[in-house]
Amino acid sequence: MRIIYKQQTMNNNRRDFIKKLGIATAAIAINPLEAKNLLDTSEPKTTNKPIVLSTWNFGLHANVEAWKVLSKGGKALDAVEKGVRLVEDDPTERSVGYGGRPDRDGRVTLDACIMDENYNIGSVACMEHIKNPISVARAVMEKTPHVMLVGDGALEFALSQGFKKENLLTAESEKEWKEWLKTSQYKPIVNIENHDTIGMIALDAQGNLSGACTTSGMAYKMHGRVGDSPIIGAGLFVDNEIGAATATGHGEEVIRTVGTHLVVELMNQGRTPQQACKEAVERIVKIVNRRGKNLKDIQVGFIALNKKGEYGAYCIQDGFNFAVHDQKGNRLETPGFALK
């Protein structure tokens, strides 16, 4: 009886392989990557979890905070909120939260969004006087029927939830703004001080993904300007069946391609996180060139993570880096870039 069972199993496996081979052969002309996945008969790889990724070198410190949650079996959602809050609280980080550079009117306006494993999302944009927009975004997600609040409405909601109203313009940021007023030249600088939006994505021990993204936006922007960071699908996107991605750099260029949604969809089609980030950047490069803009004045970087804990990153030009924390430790990595 045991021998017959083994023979039946072998026959079933052979039939399954032949079936896969036929489907994959037909798929090659349409999508080689999908065909490769169909032919893959190897055992599933061990998932690298928990793991957290974040943008730029200040991500190293943010990762440490996130890891305190993940290493104890905590949720990815709690980890990403705690991680980016650390950067929001730091007045020396001039592009996020307290101490962020103001707009051209001298007003510090903050953007943030958060997304969990169940497609729950919350976002705030152009919000003033609240140090931790990421936590307000989470409150929008958990305590309102909406997904985004902006401006005075976001502030009113934050105050109703017990958040403290504060002056976010530090003496150093105010001094720089007054110097800028002498010329009022507006030209965002690529990779300025290696600081920009902090985006963070994480996979917890339960295999669930979440992400967070927060920024004070471009320095000396027009009042009311909103970039990609608070926009789900642009600055951040999470699909718990596939993976997560977040972006940094010139938000207008990310918005044009709905960049992080594109990265996750490319992973859905079979690309690795690295391949997906590279292809998304290449699409932005193509669009920038088509619009006749100077690519040297533009930076966009993506980081991505899939359900296996595999990750990748890519950017337009040299200068971007990202932080990774997993069981191997916390480290800074430099991705490939398109503009050589």
Curated annotation (Swiss-Prot):
Membrane spanning residue stretches: none
Gene Ontology biological process terms in this record: proteolysis
Reaction(s) catalysed (UniProt annotation): N(4)-(beta-N-acetyl-D-glucosaminyl)-L-asparagine + H2O = N-acetyl-beta-D-glucosaminylamine + L-aspartate + H(+)
Origin species: Elizabethkingia miricola (Chryseobacterium miricola)
Name under which the protein is recorded: N(4)-(Beta-N-acetylglucosaminyl)-L-asparaginase
Record GO terms (molecular function): N4-(beta-N-acetylglucosaminyl)-L-asparaginase activity; peptidase activity
Entry PTM: Cleaved into an alpha and beta chain by autocatalysis; this activates the enzyme. The N-terminal residue of the beta subunit is responsible for the nucleophile hydrolase activity.
Subunit structure: Heterotetramer of two alpha and two beta chains arranged as a dimer of alpha/beta heterodimers.
Residues the record marks as active site: T197 (nucleophile)
KW RNA-binding (keyword) present: no
Binding-site residues for substrate, renumbered to this chain: R225, V226, G227, D228, T248, G249, H250, G251
Classification via Pfam families: Asparaginase_2
Family in the record: Belongs to the Ntn-hydrolase family.
Alphabetical keyword list: Autocatalytic cleavage, Hydrolase, Periplasm, Protease, Signal
SUPFAM superfamilies per UniProt: N-terminal nucleophile aminohydrolases (Ntn hydrolases)
GO CC annotations, alphabetized: cytoplasm; periplasmic space
Compartment(s) where it occurs, according to its Swiss-Prot or TrEMBL record: Periplasm
Lineage, uppermost ranks: Bacteria, Pseudomonadati, Bacteroidota, Flavobacteriia, Flavobacteriales
Function: Cleaves the GlcNAc-Asn bond which joins oligosaccharides to the peptide of asparagine-linked glycoproteins. Requires that the glycosylated asparagine moiety is not substituted on its N-(R1) and C- (R2) terminus.
EC number: 3.5.1.26
Membrane is among the record's keywords: no
Signal peptide span: 1-45
